[in-house]
Amino acid sequence: MRTVLAGSRRAPGCGEGMFILWLVLLLFPGAPAQYSVDDLGGLGRMFDGIGAISGGGATSRLLVNYPEPQRTEILDYLFKPNFGASLHIFKVEIGGDAQTTDGTEPSHMHYPDDQNYFRGYEWWLMKEAKKRNPAIKLIGLPWAFPGWIGNGKNWPYDFPDVTAYYVVSWIIGAKQYHNLDIDYIGIWNERAYDIKYIKLLRYTLDKNNLEHVKIIASDNLWQPIAFHMLQDPELLRVVDVIGAHYPGTHAAQDAILTGKTLWASEDYSTYNDEVGGGCWARILNQNYVNGNMTSTISWNMVASYYEQLPFGLEGLMTAKEPWSGNYVVSTPIWITAHTTQFTQPGWYYLKTVGHLDKGGSYVALTDRLGNLTIVIETMSHNNSICIRPPLPDYNVSAQYATFYLQGSFKNLQELQVWYSSLDINNTKPVTFKKLSPLKVQNGSFTLQLGVNEVYTITTLLTGQKGSFPDPPESKPFPLKYKDDFSVRNPPFSEAPYFADQSGVFEYFTNTSDPGDHVFTFRQVLTQRPITWASDANQAISVIGNYQWSNVTVTSDIYIETPDTGGVFVAARVDQGGSPTDRAKGIFFWVFADGTYKVTGDLMGQTILCKGLAGVRARSWHTLTLHIDGTNAFGLLNGNPLWKEVVTGGPLNGWAAIGTSCFEFAQFDNFMIEVKDSE
């Protein structure tokens, strides 16, 4: 930790002064660089806030299944003001029924005549965010769309009025059913935009008295949207924010020339250790210093998905074990707090921001009511590498920095100090530690800055490093697990721990079945969605521990589609997320035409055995898949159907259920038994 020096001009005694000068020159050669903090020349851009994303996709899937009090604690670390990350902005995926990185999120309209504003968990998360911070800004953005939007094509813009209606219905539903006011809406995450659609979206919003909802475009690169806005006055008028992803702290000149608000509307996406914290610290400052971006939004908010899915642990914190209750408050939470706890949307950057002489950067913000916050970071190259884009080499060294307070701030006498040190060589990094107040003398103060440090210097007294008792110890997924889905009024549409990777699986009530299968788990998509990734043509939901090897998976199954329908249970499934279509494992299928097959892959191309099973649609059957070492066998309704199949594929992976295409099918009395040791 570095000392904080006041800006006194009192001359020390001769001997004392020579010793201090010698020490300073030895450790920090050169006179302290001087930096002005001044609002006399006007202010910079308005600060819009720091945010995070749930979705894109299913990144918060496991969070909803946490027990209390751990679930509330996690939400407090994310959203509660002056406690943890204290997020200003919360961006969610508008579920589109398709794979969007780590899973699928359900649409509020699976079909044209279907509207349900209680599917998934984003509604709940937005309400939890608002409960803690009523001022938090909400953003909705589609990654994918249900298939009917494209009328058979993998494209949402052939009928732009239909797409606009669909998106605006989500905004209206948020208000009508959850009393949530959506502040911003996006176009199509990291995919093509359509100028006609953007204009029609603005028209549809206004027609529905949603003039307050602002449009962000295009959630991809700066170009060509900035160029098109400069060429098209109407497009320039209807787009409120140009949002770019992973901009590397720089904005395109055309984007600046539009005069529009500029955001890093998705950034970070980095493993949440000290290097991830360093990445986040650097871009939170330098996105404005280098690129005039007034908001930076992290993908993702909380890594609450199975770690072996793509981009594991790339959230501001980690909550991937609802079965144990364990979670980890990671370094990026406290780096976020360095800015969010001492600013608010509506504050203004000063024009006096920039780079430090020996590496690093500083920003200064004010509420125009006399409050001042300065955030300083000295992240080295190797301690702040983000996932993208590549980071050019640069050097940072220890330094003194003297800040002169001028304008509205010249009479400040004392400032609060919060400090972090993220050096990867430290055995125990320091995060968000409150230091003694800094006495300002003669309008200045000097900081002795080391490498990989973050300082917040502020007039505000409200900061807090919130904490709870340690969560329970980490534990693997239980070796025995079962679910009969008998929940009359489920709080969420998905059953615990199932992570849909293609298709959508929901709790279902069979009102016409008075027997043992009134409450089931149903795959509900009947059409391939407008995809964001290379989705599988089969529906699949995974569950459990990726390290499982010797496992028995059992489920009652009900094929609803005569002749062509089919379902499976599986184990050792080795892929999820965007490459789900390439998943391998052991898949035990039965079909409505009376056949069965066992395959080594989800696509069904590697057939290990096949034959007749006598299964028909609209009748309940029980499938059991047993794998031990290199051998597998299967049971139908408790009787052997096939045996002595040599696996030959992945040695471990998740358990799974699914369907042979996008079709209605039901599952019940699901059970896993694992022989592996914990």
Curated annotation (Swiss-Prot):
Binding site for substrate: 101, 143, 189, 388
Enzyme class: hydrolase
Signal peptide: 1-33
Glycan attachment positions: 292, 371, 382, 395, 425, 442, 510, 550
Compartment(s): Lysosome
InterPro entries: Aldolase_TIM (IPR013785), GH59_C (IPR049162), GH59_cat (IPR049161), Glyco_hydro_59 (IPR001286), Glyco_hydro_59_dom (IPR035394), Glycoside_hydrolase_SF (IPR017853)
Key word Zinc-finger present: no
Residue positions of the active site: 190 (proton donor/acceptor), 266 (nucleophile)
GO biological process terms held by the UniProt record: galactosylceramide catabolic process
Catalytic activity: a beta-D-galactosyl-(1<->1')-N-acylsphing-4-enine + H2O = an N-acylsphing-4-enine + D-galactose; beta-D-galactosyl-(1<->1)-sphing-4-enine + H2O = sphing-4-enine + D-galactose; a D-galactosylceramide + H2O = an N-acyl-sphingoid base + D-galactose
Domain of life the protein comes from: Eukaryota
E.C. number(s) listed in UniProt: 3.2.1.46
Entry GO CC: lysosome; membrane
Homology family: Belongs to the glycosyl hydrolase 59 family.
The protein's role, per its UniProt record: Hydrolyzes the galactose ester bonds of glycolipids such as galactosylceramide and galactosylsphingosine.
Name of this protein: Galactocerebrosidase
